[in-house]
């Protein structure tokens, strides 16, 4: 992906700074998920996650130049990006436009008419939850207000998810690939066992599987 933006600036997805920013959002997304929905991380877990995010990035074979060396360095980098670099673009708006949100793959039995009635409320809640995960500076950039009532709602949802997650058996909390990795490491599966693909429940609906927006094994 590359080109020239509306201000005449050239861009390319493989630019090291651009490529690392995408990776940084994966790291922060994992961090926010743990903090908001899983009761948080210990200091040791924070350090481990940061170190693993660097190790993961190194696997891409890209320059390590943009990668902060410490968590403190990363926080400064993140704050700078959110406050001074990010822009409100059509791509950002597309992510937040859930007006055509498809029926979840795990509810194939739900009639389309029923989903059409449920979709507006689901979309509003999903966007509200997403905005709650944003830094305040990003909310401001995109024009979202955030009241005490919004924060209270957000915290209640996070707490409900955290409590529900505790009821899920430990093995079922992991993605099938992560679970298989643990099983290979502990000897439950042979070290050369084939990697599992995305489970059927996670696949897009059949009429959307040819879209380049989705990864579908064997397509």
Residue ranges of predicted features:
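Mature, function-bearing regions of proteins
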Residues: 1-219
């Amino acid at each position: 992906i590359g080109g020239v933006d509306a201000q005449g600036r050239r861009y390319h997805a493989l630019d090291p700074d651009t490529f690392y920013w995408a990776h940084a959002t994966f790291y922060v997304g994992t961090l926010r998920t743990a903090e908001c929905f899983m009761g948080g991380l210990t200091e040791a877990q924070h350090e481990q996650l940061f170190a693993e995010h660097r190790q993961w990035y190194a696997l891409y074979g890209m320059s390590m130049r943009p990668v902060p060396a410490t968590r403190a360095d990363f926080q400064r980098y993140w704050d700078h990006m959110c406050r001074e670099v990010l822009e409100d673009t059509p791509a950002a708006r597309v992510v937040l436009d859930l007006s055509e949100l498809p029926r979840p793959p795990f509810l194939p039995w739900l009639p389309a008419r029923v989903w059409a009635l449920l979709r507006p409320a689901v979309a509003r809640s999903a966007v509200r939850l997403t905005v709650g995960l944003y830094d305040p500076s990003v909310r401001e950039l995109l024009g979202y207000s955030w009241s005490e009532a919004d924060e209270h709602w957000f915290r209640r949802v996070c707490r409900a998810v955290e409590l529900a997650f505790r009821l899920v058996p430990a093995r079922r909390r992991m993605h099938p690939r992560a679970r298989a990795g643990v099983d290979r490491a502990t000897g439950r599966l042979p070290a050369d066992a084939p990697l599992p693909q995305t489970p059927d429940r996670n696949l897009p609906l059949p009429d959307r599987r040819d879209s380049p927006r989705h990864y579908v094994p064997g397509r």
